[in-house]
């Protein structure tokens, strides 16, 4: 399991006191301690190498600026062929009233620079998948893939999509591929040879969304194939 800390894992012991991660969090898991980070981030920010995949877990609740250098170092030093980043708050939020501008301003450029393949988010109680294509030096959009971004929801609490807000991310190069509301999901990610396959299923086990990233490991170029099952 790759636990990702969310906003509900943080609490304050009294009004006006700083929030800290829940006392239930650390006893439940045995997670890496990144000693270069502040103690408040220990066991909530970490990196796991699983076979040929590097998974970087970010704490999107606390000390965001101090994590930026950590993220870049983990990506710069990465020897794995695939890079996945996950945090609770959505980089490209599809829900009304949600906006994680810091991530788009500070983290997305790093994801672009080091070719992150997939970013997995939650928090918004709705579903959206999109991607950022590679652009040429003069800003022209190409058919090559940069990063796939997913925001998903597994619980029964649901919010509505904000299509206008999603459209506003065009200035960041984001292109929506699929979206849904009032639906619970779980995802399966499979890596085999030069392909990463992402599939979203409804709570009833029906396939809803599929994306395949195909990568040329020599050039680093990637292509995206999307299938909207519904």
Where are these regions (language model features)?
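Active-site-proximal segments of metal-dependent phosphoesterases and phosphodiesterases across multiple
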Residues: 78-119, 139-142, 168-169
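Catalytic-core region of carbohydrate-active enzymes that cleave or remodel glycosidic bonds
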Residues: 1, 108-122, 126, 183
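Active-site glycine-centered loops adjacent to acidic/histidine catalytic or metal-binding residues
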Residues: 6-7, 88, 122-123
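Hydrophobic anchor at the start of a short beta-strand
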Residues: 1, 83, 196
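Short, catalytically relevant binding-site loops at active-site mouths
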Residues: 91-92, 125-127
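Extended active-site neighborhood of metal-dependent phosphoesterases/phosphodiesterases
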Residues: 1-79, 106, 128-180, 185-188
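A short C-terminal boundary segment appended to hydrolase-like catalytic domains
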Residues: 160-162, 167-230
């Amino acid at each position: 399991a790759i636990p990702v800390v969310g906003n509900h894992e943080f609490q304050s012991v009294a009004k006006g006191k700083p929030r800290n991660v829940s006392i239930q969090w650390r006893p439940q898991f045995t997670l890496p301690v990144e000693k270069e980070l502040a103690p408040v981030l220990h066991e909530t920010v970490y990196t796991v190498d699983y076979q040929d995949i590097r998974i970087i877990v970010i704490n999107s609740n606390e000390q965001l600026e101090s994590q930026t250098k950590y993220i870049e170092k983990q990506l710069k030093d990465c020897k794995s062929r695939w890079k996945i980043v996950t945090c609770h708050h959505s980089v490209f939020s599809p829900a009304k009233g949600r906006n994680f501008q810091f991530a788009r301003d500070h983290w997305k450029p790093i994801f672009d620079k080091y070719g992150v393949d997939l970013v997995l988010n939650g928090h918004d109680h709705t579903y959206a998948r999109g991607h950022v294509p590679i652009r040429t030096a003069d800003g022209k959009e190409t058919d090559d893939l940069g990063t796939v971004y997913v925001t998903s929801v597994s619980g029964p609490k649901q919010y509505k999509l904000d299509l206008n807000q999603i459209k506003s991310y065009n200035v960041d190069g984001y292109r929506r591929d699929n979206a849904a509301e009032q639906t619970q999901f779980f995802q399966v990610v499979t890596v085999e040879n030069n392909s990463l396959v992402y599939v979203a299923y409804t709570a009833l086990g029906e396939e809803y969304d599929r994306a395949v990233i195909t990568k040329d490991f020599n050039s680093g170029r990637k292509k995206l194939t999307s299938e909207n099952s519904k």
